[in-house]
């Protein structure tokens, strides 16, 4: 492909993105890119020609036949959570930035439909190439987890096309707990227990209520901590959307425990989710999503979770909520 102006990571990324187009779209795009000078024998030939004759990744993505929705879905498959109303030129920039940041990484392939239970992908932390590094980078773990969790959950929204993977109880420990606090026209707190119930309640947010949760993964929106017992806590804040409307903000705490039977795999032990509708905030203000608790709050929360029983955990959550710390989610 000596004619192509694409880097290796751009080449692989565009190849995966083109996998979201059907055969007719691929053939039509090939005609456009090559000015009908190439007559491909099959889909593989057409993709090869498209990549070879594209002068740059941006030129290819700007083609009218590469629709905005296709780029959006591709980014979702890579765990990159973008608000649904994002314009095409901004989506292109997100894709270019993603490819530029990881030239040495093997990009995720666009997923095939899941048909068997054993094919379901659990959250796995990417293993560093440096095998000597025994310490877990919890900040990186938190970022990877959020990309995976929100990308998978948001992809279940029927307005965004086919899901990128199968959502279900397999991602949670069987005794997982969800505390869901939401403040819209009135305040409500609900508790859910068990992997099946928790996974269904979270699924209903995007599949039935059509919400889109967009996490803020900068230093203010994401905080992580760990305990000697192996529990990892991830605190994240972000905005809540439905279509082109921003409805409010959210704060969420996850408790993760490594699965001892599958290498580098973590499952969710508990979730505290707080959603605040715009109507519950000061008029005309929508603050930048940020986690309002500190590292010490997470570590203190740990000690209760890992040592005490369910009743004491709930008591700790209530105390934190009353005191105004970040554990109020």
Curated annotation (Swiss-Prot):
**Domain of life here?**
Eukaryota
* GO terms classed as biological process: apoptotic process; positive regulation of apoptotic process
Name a Pfam family for this protein: DUF4518
Q: Which keywords annotate this record?
A: Acetylation, Apoptosis
According to its UniProt entry, the function of this protein is described as: May be involved in apoptosis regulation.
Cellular compartments per GO CC: nucleus
Its protein name is Uncharacterized protein C3orf38
Listed InterPro entries? NTF2-like_dom_sf (IPR032710), UPF_C3orf38 (IPR026698)
């Amino acid at each position: 492909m000596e004619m192509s102006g694409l880097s290796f990571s751009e080449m692989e990324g565009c190849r995966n993105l083109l996998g979201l187009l059907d055969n007719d779209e691929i053939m039509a795009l090939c005609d456009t890119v090559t000015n009908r000078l190439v007559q491909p024998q099959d889909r593989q030939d057409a993709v090869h020609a498209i990549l070879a004759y594209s002068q740059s990744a941006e030129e290819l993505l700007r083609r009218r036949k590469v629709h905005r929705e296709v780029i959006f879905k591709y980014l979702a498959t890579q765990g990159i959570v973008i608000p649904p109303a994002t314009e095409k030129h901004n989506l292109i920039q997100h894709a270019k930035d993603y490819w530029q940041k990881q030239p040495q990484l093997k990009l995720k392939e666009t997923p095939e439909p899941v048909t068997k239970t054993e094919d379901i992908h659990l959250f796995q932390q990417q293993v560093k190439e440096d095998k000597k590094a025994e310490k877990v980078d919890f900040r990186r773990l938190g970022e990877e987890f959020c990309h995976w969790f929100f990308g998978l959950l948001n992809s279940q929204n029927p307005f965004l096309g086919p899901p990128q993977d199968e959502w279900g109880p397999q991602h949670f420990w069987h005794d997982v707990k969800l505390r869901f606090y939401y403040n819209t026209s009135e305040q409500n707190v609900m508790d859910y227990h068990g992997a099946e119930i928790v996974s269904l309640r979270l699924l209903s947010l995007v599949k039935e209520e059509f919400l889109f949760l967009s996490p803020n993964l900068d230093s203010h929106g994401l905080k992580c901590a760990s305990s000697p017992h192996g529990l990892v806590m991830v605190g994240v804040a972000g905005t809540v959307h439905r279509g082109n409307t921003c409805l409010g903000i959210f704060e969420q705490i996850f408790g993760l425990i490594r699965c001892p039977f599958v290498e580098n795999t973590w499952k969710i032990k508990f979730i505290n989710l707080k959603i605040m509708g715009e109507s519950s905030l000061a008029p005309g203000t929508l603050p930048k999503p940020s986690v309002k608790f500190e590292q010490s709050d997470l570590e203190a929360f740990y000690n209760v979770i890992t040592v005490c029983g369910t009743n004491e955990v709930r008591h700790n959550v209530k105390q934190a909520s009353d005191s105004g710390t970040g554990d109020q989610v």
